[in-house]
Regions:
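Thiamine diphosphate
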Residues: 1-292
Length: 292
């Protein structure tokens, strides 16, 4: 699955107003499609919601085999299996998409992607309780922990345009590791401190002067909440650092020195903020930390 290292790709999305990361992902797909002629993909009957259409590229069919948009129908498991098959065939770069809560149906094939070293990209939108009118059946809770528990799968939950760009560049550059992009339905404001450091999986997005007394760690839609909480705590005289953790797996791939610089052991007061299950955050917050 050799490919160009798109992590050095200079084109990053710009964001001037609040926008959903699913929409930003759709823009990134349409930026990358010209850079990756073999890029092909689609959704399990949720294309308009997942924002996965490549504009002007036509629909794949028996009559139009050159079409780059695949309509898989309501069959998430088969879709992911087909995605693996496309990648194993070679010459093409595939992505598949559905609602995040339906990653339960995708999981067996995602596990095979990870086992086989197939760098398929999973676009998973509507990532928390902010899913609209569908209610609890469509509200993912434990799915994020489930995917993060899978060896050789990178799970990216970006907070804005910059991090969404980093997520797609990481996915497009991967040679042996599949990537899951976990994206919002609701609009998120751009975060001033977000940067290409997101390519490292975790980084300081908003810092204080000197040594922090408290570290707030968040991903996706909760990064904005962490930044707002920092402002309130600092108004009370507390030194706070905010760490954005869009991809735990990538963060763990960084050097011990880098990880220590971002999350110094000496700072034991830590709070993780994420609108899903707290499972998996213990290694970052420690025994003295908390989860919201």
């Amino acid at each position: 699955f050799g490919c160009r290292a798109y992590t050095d790709f200079e084109v990053m999305l710009e964001q001037e107003k609040p926008e959903a990361t699913r929409s930003l992902s759709g823009k990134m797909i349409n930026l990358l499609k010209d850079e990756i002629p073999g890029m092909i993909g689609g959704s399990a009957d949720l294309g308009p919601s997942n924002k996965t259409e490549m504009k002007g590229e036509g629909d794949f069919s028996a009559e139009n085999p050159a079409g780059r948009n695949i309509h898989f129908g309501v069959r998430e498991l088969a879709m992911a299996a087909i995605g693996n098959g496309i990648m194993l065939h070679g010459g093409l770069r595939a992505y598949v998409a559905t609602f995040f809560v339906f990653s339960d149906y995708v999981k067996p094939m995602a596990r095979l992607s990870a086992l086989m070293g197939v760098p398929l990209t999973f676009v998973l939108t509507h990532d928390s309780i902010g899913v609209g009118e569908d209610g609890p059946t469509h509200e993912p809770i434990e799915q994020l922990a489930m995917l993060r528990a899978m060896p050789n799968l990178r799970v990216f939950r970006p907070c804005d345009a910059t991090e969404t760009s980093a997520a797609w560049l990481t996915a497009a550059s991967s040679e042996k590791t599949p990537t899951a992009l976990v994206l919002t339905r609701q609009n998120l404001a751009p975060i001033t401190g977000s940067s290409r450091e997101a390519l490292k999986g975790g980084y300081v997005i908003d810092d204080c002067e000197g040594t922090p007394e408290v570290i707030l760690i968040a991903s996706g839609s909760e990064v904005e909440l962490a930044v707002k909480a920092k402002a309130e705590l600092e108004a009370e005289g507390t030194k706070v650092r905010v760490v954005s953790m869009p991809c735990m797996e990538l963060f763990e791939e960084q050097s011990a020195e880098y990880r220590e610089a971002v999350l110094p052991r000496a700072v034991r007061k830590r709070v993780a903020i994420e609108a899903l299950s707290d499972f998996g955050w213990g290694k970052y917050v420690g025994l003295d930390g908390a989860y919201v």
